[in-house]
Amino acid sequence: MQDDPENSKLYDLLNSHLDVHGRSNEEPRQTGDSRSQSSGNTGENEEDIAFASGLNGGTFDSMLEALPDDLYFTDFVSPFTAAATTSVTTKTVKDTTPATNHMDDDIAMFDSLATTQPIDIAASNQQNGEIAQLWDFNVDQFNMTPSNSSGSATISAPNSFTSDIPQYNHGSLGNSVSKSSLFPYNSSTSNSNINQPSINNNSNTNAQSHHSFNIYKLQNNNSSSSAMNITNNNNSNNSNIQHPFLKKSDSIGLSSSNTTNSVRKNSLIKPMSSTSLANFKRAASVSSSISNMEPSGQNKKPLIQCFNCKTFKTPLWRRSPEGNTLCNACGLFQKLHGTMRPLSLKSDVIKKRISKKRAKQTDPNIAQNTPSAPATASTSVTTTNAKPIRSRKKSLQQNSLSRVIPEEIIRDNIGNTNNILNVNRGGYNFNSVPSPVLMNSQSYNSSNANFNGASNANLNSNNLMRHNSNTVTPNFRRSSRRSSTSSNTSSSSKSSSRSVVPILPKPSPNSANSQQFNMNMNLMNTTNNVSAGNSVASSPRIISSANFNSNSPLQQNLLSNSFQRQGMNIPRRKMSRNASYSSSFMAASLQQLHEQQQVDVNSNTNTNSNRQNWNSSNSVSTNSRSSNFVSQKPNFDIFNTPVDSPSVSRPSSRKSHTSLLSQQLQNSESNSFISNHKFNNRLSSDSTSPIKYEADVSAGGKISEDNSTKGSSKESSAIADELDWLKFGI
């Protein structure tokens, strides 16, 4: 807005000239019109000559044609040569510049702007003469806005805004304002100027020199020579300045804001362009002007180079104690070792440290920022990858073991009850397993089908194995843990724990309620096994209370397994131990085994009927073996493995194979299992799993006895031995 006061001052100057000449506002307007049309006075002739020269020159034509907008400019010139108008209103501007279409729109703005400023200016008209000289002098001295002072003073007579702004813009900014149309009111006039073909910067600079020169000449009757000198200087400066502003036409706000300081701002813009990115880009746009190009080029930050290794690229620039610029590597080396980093250590690759991987690495590796770092990183990666691979192998092995045993168990169970096995297979799905509450609520006759779920019914032994492997992988881990705990018992107990022992319904195979109860028991066992299976009391309590005539939870599990009335086997996530996971449970299980052995006689009748199921429920023996572990796991294994899996098929004969607890359970059940043992022996002979062999190995010669135990006496002896062994293990 400095332009406005300047314009007002210039306008005042114009008014002062007008006042000095004593012309009325209307007279200069008329004279201006007549001048624009024809030269009335000698001064007017000079103006017309100037205009004619501009028009003929073509360089100044834009100014002149802007002047049709600037007809007030002609009026403004007239006051110097002939009486000039004190002030030209926008209405007069409209009259004087009917040719400009843009002016009409801008005139409304001019009305507000021009009218308001002339009012302010009118008060200072008395000072105009002094101000004009001061303006010329200041411009002359500082080369600030000579064209502004001269051009604006001359041009701005009628309208401080219309004539003044384009004028000083021509002078200081060149045609920047006319092109950029910084001010909307000027934008119209400047647009009209822009519309003129002769607006070229060079032509403007030259024409400007002529234009302003003529204007000064015409205007400054008092100080024409100074004005001419000023204009020449201004033109020379403006010729340089104009180009950037013309190219910066969109960003001319700075220059336009201060007409007097426009040149100064140009000089300021040069360093700014070097410093700030935006200004630098701006300077690049301005770069056409030599003045801006040179400073911008000079001001570009020189590429920073490491004093030591001469590199240009580093994540962080450092400084040596001497103040030399160093790259990050050299700076750190200097800081740590106090010497310059040898160039032999220089590498083209900037190495980044990965804290997690590097933490495992030794300091020397860290010190070596070179290939060792990536190598160490790769090694750490490989090591980290190796661990999961091992765990995967373990889980796969567990899966394979569980698969093998369940297959045999399922096969035996299939021989007994394919439906039950199918139910168990499907039922093994934990996803399909309803919550214990639901399980309890469901009757097992219906719940067997429901519990198994549609997908379970569809599962065959092969699919079941896949399904079990998919569902049980977390369980295998648990089972592996259990097996590790049960490893005290024997490897066979591990295998038996891995072998799925389906939890069968209550000993009465006929009662759906007992089945439901067994299912509830199984669910409770499953839940207990999952949650508190380790607690000896909890799982046995649930088992004993829930399941059976037989007191021992293991037998109950076994019975439920053996019964599996409608494939009641309730899948347990922790199949390794139905009763509990802890070895302490084994002690309880031993007691329960004795009880079960007693109860087994009772339950054995059930199991005899269920033996075929119980063949799968070798898991019963498995449960007895790993009573802590087996009961759940055998259920799992039964679900996982086909009926044939020997763990299920070995009631007493496999007892040696199974954990001692399971064997004891089998022995206790041996009376009932004698037939079952025969059947189981058949099954065991039919299918032997590595688990059984492990159990046999653990059991020692008992395995052969158990395998040969088609007679109850052998079974009973094996049972006693197993019980002793379990006691010893406990």
Swiss-Prot record:
Listed Polar residues bias regions: 33-43, 252-262
Subcellular location as annotated: Nucleus
Pfam families, alphabetized: GATA
InterPro entries, sorted: Transcription_factor_GATA (IPR039355), Znf_GATA (IPR000679), Znf_NHR/GATA (IPR013088)
Annotated Low complexity bias: 224-240, 370-384, 449-470, 482-499, 596-631, 641-651, 658-672
GO terms for MF: DNA-binding transcription factor activity; DNA-binding transcription factor activity, RNA polymerase II-specific; RNA polymerase II cis-regulatory region sequence-specific DNA binding; sequence-specific DNA binding; zinc ion binding
Region annotation Disordered: where it falls in the sequence: 1-45, 187-208, 224-262, 355-398, 449-516, 593-673, 696-717
GO CC annotations, alphabetized: cytosol; nucleus
Phosphoserine sites (modified residues): S251, S267, S285, S469, S552, S562
Key words, A-Z: Activator, DNA-binding, Metal-binding, Nitrate assimilation, Nucleus, Phosphoprotein, Transcription, Transcription regulation, Zinc, Zinc-finger
GO aspect biological process, one term: nitrate assimilation
Main location: nucleus
Feature: compositional bias, Basic and acidic residues: 18-32
Task of the protein: Positive nitrogen regulatory protein. Required for the activation of transcription of a number of genes (including the allantoin pathway genes) in response to the replacement of glutamine by glutamate as source of nitrogen. Binds the nitrogen upstream activation sequence of GLN1, the gene encoding glutamine synthetase. URE2 may catalytically inactivate GLN3 in response to an increase in the intracellular concentration of glutamine.
Entries under PANTHER family matching the protein: BOX A-BINDING FACTOR-RELATED, TRANSCRIPTION FACTOR GATA FAMILY MEMBER
Protein name listed in UniProt: Nitrogen regulatory protein GLN3
Taxonomic placement: Eukaryota, Fungi, Dikarya, Ascomycota, Saccharomycotina
